[in-house]
UniProtKB/Swiss-Prot annotation:
Gene Ontology MF term list: ATP binding; ATP hydrolysis activity; identical protein binding; preribosome binding
UniProt keyword annotation of DNA-binding present: no
Superkingdom of the source species: Eukaryota
Gene name of the encoded protein: Afg2b
Protein name stated in the entry: ATPase family gene 2 protein homolog B
Principal cellular location given in the protein's record: cytoplasm
């Protein structure tokens, strides 16, 4: 249905409506009959329109399909740089017919897409002719390429022509189009760019780039060598590309961004030719002012050399090294490479004189995630009840791209939930909780170990109150109350050992610990580690800790550690795989395995207590055979806290039975107190199995219509479910606790 018509609402004002989808990328302006008559325009007449949000665009006049006055719709495909179409009202005096004589010659500056590589001038001109065919253009305006149109060109800057296309000119089939050799003046005006969570890294990169680009002669006079190449390393999605573009914009440098895989050619020598062409183009830009060449995914272009079948890659690496060595002649030329696999780069590329400096962007910390969320949600209608600090705590391991996807999914949930109120949707906390189910951290994908857990609350574990308190003191309290711990001179333990009889909820306690801490959780078992190949198990364990350090705060859980690690004092001869895995674990606990590329951030004195503690990695191990563990693992500084998880006493068994029967229709004749007294030597797993068997007996007796579990069903279940613990085992653990490990356990 057409909107209500009128001559001109609010006097001589036209209401600006969104462009008709059928008019996208046509450069058309839809007007009513009265506006046509007022302007004296004809069908297809060029119009120069001043936009209410700033800037102007060049369109052709076309009548509205519903012939309603008082409204205007336009497609700003040819507009001034930075122009933006926003809803509002514009006056009739903002619409001016302009003459557009046919152009004999037109000069443009193409803006290439990042993945375009180094296309030839003929390929670029072919796309330019197709894009500008039979269109009006204006000097200083930018013509954008429609989305989905293939080709290397993203946009065109109109530089000039004959006759001068100011205020307008018409491109005809006879117009001779050439590519300008001079870039447009200040295509992107410098200004501070909001980089959520990257301000510290941006400052480091900005200082590295600003000095050689702005003060090359002064540095040469002082005899200082400035870096010619900078390598950005970090996981995918942290914002490496965005950071380089923002810093180049702020420093006023001309940015030439290239995706390294796009330079790969199919025929021999084509890749080297593309690389030379890109460097030549960057040096031409440097001859006119500061220039920055950005090579994204540089590891695809310069992999580690070696092997008989890698001759083509070796030639490409040699070509890049030669070109990097020749940069010193251009004082206003800097190369920036980005990779998420720095270890795959050829070592010759990472020496001084080529990539002199390396800037590491790690997975965002707590404060950085909060800053990123503030930037992303600044233009979103979020509820005032949403605590971004709490969201930042819940998004451990999320990079900038993950947080963007999370907010986008939350917005979609809000939109679908409020379909009837789409004019003013509001994003609530429930929308973010729903989005958490669909958006997982990208850094957890394709990783060793279980990265996600089914949430378990402390209240779902019956008994063991002393053990729960000790676990909270060791892990939860340092993360939630860092200032109090710092005031008392306390530090978080490096490692925790849980030992006790089987079935006493050791693994469930760790799951509850990970649920309450909002930290990354990595669970590793023996099957994940052991491999038939020599050295593979140690490599996997190192990778687990590297992954955990990249997603701090992190909790690494090694279940049944006695089956994973060996002891150098009992029953082994020589150096088997288990002893080598033990050696790697000891080194990781001591911090020997931390690589330089994983360190990030500033000095600890410049960080808040919470930010420091949230960078920690804690290991929790569980076993029912602590007597076979190596003594070096049990000393303070490695597994600082050793906690005995005892079998439940009568009070603990009663608490466990209450938890197990919480969702079970138990009859009034059932006495949980008597059951707790009759189940001596039952572990927590045995009690849960007992309740399940009683429920099954109720179904067997009364059929599928059964509604109650009575005392007789529990009595029958006691005849089949036997305790898994024996007096001998309990005596063994009690003696072990009192004699063998008492010096490390503070009871």
């Amino acid at each position: 249905m057409a909107p209500d018509s009128g001559p001109f609402p609010d006097g001589q004002l036209l209401k600006l409506l969104p462009v008709d989808p059928r008019d996208r990328d046509t450069q058309r302006c839809r007007l009513g009959p009265a506006a046509f008559r007022s302007l004296g325009a004809r069908l297809g007449s060029p119009l120069r329109i001043s936009l209410p949000a700033g800037g102007c665009c060049l369109c052709t006049a076309w009548p509205r399909r519903d012939r309603v006055d008082g409204f205007v719709q336009l497609d700003p495909q040819c507009a001034s740089p930075g122009a933006r179409v926003a809803t509002g009202r514009i006056g009739m005096d903002c619409l001016q017919p302009v003459p557009c004589p046919p152009l004999r010659r037109l000069e443009v500056w193409p803006v290439l897409r990042p993945q375009a590589g180094a296309p030839s001038s003929a390929a670029v001109l072919e796309v330019v002719h197709e894009l500008l065919r039979n269109r009006p253009v204006s000097r200083g305006h930018v013509v954008t390429t429609p989305p989905g149109v293939p080709g290397p060109v993203a946009a065109l800057h109109v530089m000039g022509g004959t006759p001068d296309p100011e205020p307008g000119g018409w491109v005809t089939p006879h117009t001779r189009i050439t590519l300008s050799d001079k870039p447009p003046p200040q295509v992107e005006p410098p200004g501070e760019v909001t980089l959520g969570g990257l301000s510290e890294t941006a400052d480091s990169l900005r200082e590295l780039l600003r000095l050689p680009l702005r003060y090359p002669l002064a540095l040469a006079a002082l005899g200082l060598a400035v870096p010619r190449g900078v390598l950005l390393a970090g996981p995918p999605g942290v914002g490496k590309t965005q950071l380089v573009r923002a810093v180049a914009r702020e420093t006023g440098a001309e940015l030439l961004a290239v995706s390294a895989p796009a330079l790969q050619g199919s025929r021999p020598g084509e890749t080297e030719e593309n690389v030379r062409r890109i460097f030549q183009r960057a040096q031409e830009l440097a001859s006119r002012g500061p220039s920055l060449l950005f090579l994204d995914e540089v590891d695809a272009l310069c992999p580690r050399r070696g092997g008989p079948h890698r001759a083509p890659e070796s030639r490409v690496v040699a070509q890049v090294l030669t070109l990097l060595d020749g940069i010193h002649r251009d004082r206003e030329f800097v190369v920036v490479g980005a990779t998420n696999r720095p270890d795959e780069l050829d070592p010759a590329l990472r020496r001084p004189g080529r990539f002199d400096r390396e800037v590491v962007i790690g997975t965002p910390t707590l404060k950085q995630r909060e800053a990123i969320l503030q930037v992303i949600t600044s233009k979103m209608p979020i509820s005032s009840h949403i605590d971004l600090g709490l969201l930042a705590e819940m998004t451990v391991g999320y990079v900038g791209a993950d947080l963007t996807a999370l907010c986008r999914e939350a917005a979609m949930c809000a939109l679908l939930k409020n379909e009837k109120n789409q004019d003013s949707p509001k994003i609530e906390e429930t929308d973010f909780l729903e989005a958490f189910k669909k958006i997982q951290p990208s850094s957890f994908r394709s990783s060793t170990g279980l990265m996600d857990i089914k949430p378990v609350g402390w209240e779902q574990i019956g008994g063991l109150e002393d053990v729960k308190l000790k676990l909270k003191q060791c892990v939860e309290w340092p993360l939630k109350f860092p200032q109090e711990f710092a005031r008392m001179g306390l530090t978080q333990p490096k490692g925790l050992l849980l030992y006790g009889p089987p079935g006493c909820a050791k693994t469930t306690l760790v799951r509850a610990l990970a649920t309450g801490c909002h930290c990354s959780f990595v669970s590793v078992c023996g099957a994940d580690l052991f491999s038939p190949f020599v050295g593979d198990s140690e490599k996997v364990l190192s990778q687990v800790f590297r992954q955990a350090r990249a997603n701090t705060p992190a909790l690494v859980f090694l279940d049944e550690i006695d089956s994973v690690l060996g002891s150098r004092s009992v029953g082994t001869s020589g150096c088997d795989a288990r002893e080598r895995v033990l050696s790697v674990l000891l080194n990781e606990l001591d911090g020997v395995g931390v690589r330089t590329v994983e360190r990030r951030g500033s000095k600890a004195s410049q960080q808040e207590c919470q930010e420091i503690l949230s960078r920690s990695v804690m290991i929790v191990v569980a076993t029912n055979r602590p007597d076979v563990l190596d003594d070096a693992l049990l000393r303070p500084g490695r597994l600082d806290k050793i906690i005995y998880v005892p079998p439940p006493d009568q009070e603990g068994r009663l608490s466990i039975l209450k938890v197990c029967t919480n969702n079970m229709p138990v009859g009034p004749d059932v006495s949980l107190e008597n059951l707790a007294a009759e189940t001596c030597f039952f572990s927590g797993a045995d009690l849960r199995n007992l309740c399940k068997e009683a429920a099954l007996f109720a179904l067997q007796e009364n059929g599928l219509e059964a509604t109650t579990v009575r005392q007789e069903h529990f009595t029958e279940a006691l005849k089949t479910v036997k305790p898994s613990l024996t007096l001998k085992e309990l005596t063994f653990y009690e003696n072990l606790f009192k004699k063998g490990l008492s010096n490390l356990e503070d009871d």
